[in-house]
Every structure is written in structure tokens, then in C-alpha cells.
Amino acid sequence: MKQFLDFLPLVVFFAFYKIYDIYAATTALIVATAIVLIYSWVRFRKVEKMALITFVLVVVFGGLTLFFHNDEFIKWKVTVIYALFAGALLVSQWVMKKPLIQRMLGKELTLPQPVWSKLNLAWAVFFILCGLANIYIAFWLPQNIWVNFKVFGLTALTLIFTLLSGIYIYRHMPQEDKS
């Protein structure tokens, strides 16, 4: 259910883009993200920090897109979110000395410290590369290609990287945890 809620604004954005234009899609994205946030609060009495940050960025960059009637702002949102994710992962590892991935999954998984560090760094690099790819596609290719990349390309890349991370984790789990 939660994964569906996370992807709902993206689906709404894509549908409105295909039916109308980038500005209607941006408006729909803001509304859908707000509805999902409100629903999460009412249903689960909890809103995740990243969902709240994403909502704020959607409102800010979406609002700028609509106010200035300039789609470059909504295109930057993707890269800014990925930069924040990468930054949080790197700060957790290099400043706080405990990888964010370990903080998020450490209660469920037992892994050696170097594995947590490599996994954390891999996700940071992944987010940086996705942000850079977004910049290139958003500003050098036609808008419809960027929308398809944002909706399908980044989603597929994230799913593939999640699967690869799962394989990496499984390979490094203690033998008794694998069964």
C-alpha cells in the first residue's frame, strides 16, 4: 500500500502530462503529493521525513514552475532531491560515522560494517549519477523524453539498483540469517 502511495503522484503527473501539458501535470503533482501526505497522516498517524521534504520541494519547485510558467524549475526538482539523498548518505557516513542505510535497515539485517559503508556509498553514487542524468536529459533533450525518463527510466533504474543491493546484502549476510 505504501509503495502505491509513493508512486501515485508520479502516475498522476504522467497522466496529466500526456492528456494536457507540463503545467497541468505540475499542478496535479502538487495536489496528488499533498493528498498522499494528508492520507498518510490520517491513516498511519505518521509522515516520513523524506516524504515531507519531497512535498516541500514539489511545492517550491512546482510553484515556481507555475508562477513563472517555466518548466525548468520542475525539472530541477528531481536533481535537487537526488542531491539531498546523496548528501544525507555521505554526511551520515563521513560526519556522523554511521551510514544512513545502516540506521534504516540495521535492526532487520546483520551485516559487517564495511558492507554497510560500501552499500551506503553505492547508493550515494547512484543518486549522484541519477541527478546528473536528469540534468542532461532535462536540459538537452525534448520535454517528452524527460517526462518518460523521469517516470519510467528513473523508476526502473531505482528498482534495478534496489535488486542489485538486495543481492549484495544477501551475499554478505551471516550464514544463519540466510535461512
Swiss-Prot record:
Q: What are the protein's UniProt keywords?
A: Cell inner membrane, Cell membrane, Membrane, Transmembrane, Transmembrane helix
One Gene Ontology cellular component term attached to this UniProt record is: plasma membrane
Q: Where in the cell is it found?
A: Cell inner membrane
Q: Where are the transmembrane segments?
A: 22-42, 50-70, 76-96, 121-141, 149-169
Keyword check for Membrane: yes
Q: How does it sit in the membrane?
A: Multi-pass membrane protein
Question: What is stated as this protein's family in its record?
Answer: Belongs to the YciB family.
Q: What task does this protein carry out?
A: Plays a role in cell envelope biogenesis, maintenance of cell envelope integrity and membrane homeostasis.
Name of the protein: Inner membrane-spanning protein YciB
Record organism: Shigella dysenteriae serotype 1 (strain Sd197)
Question: Quick one: which gene encodes this?
Answer: yciB
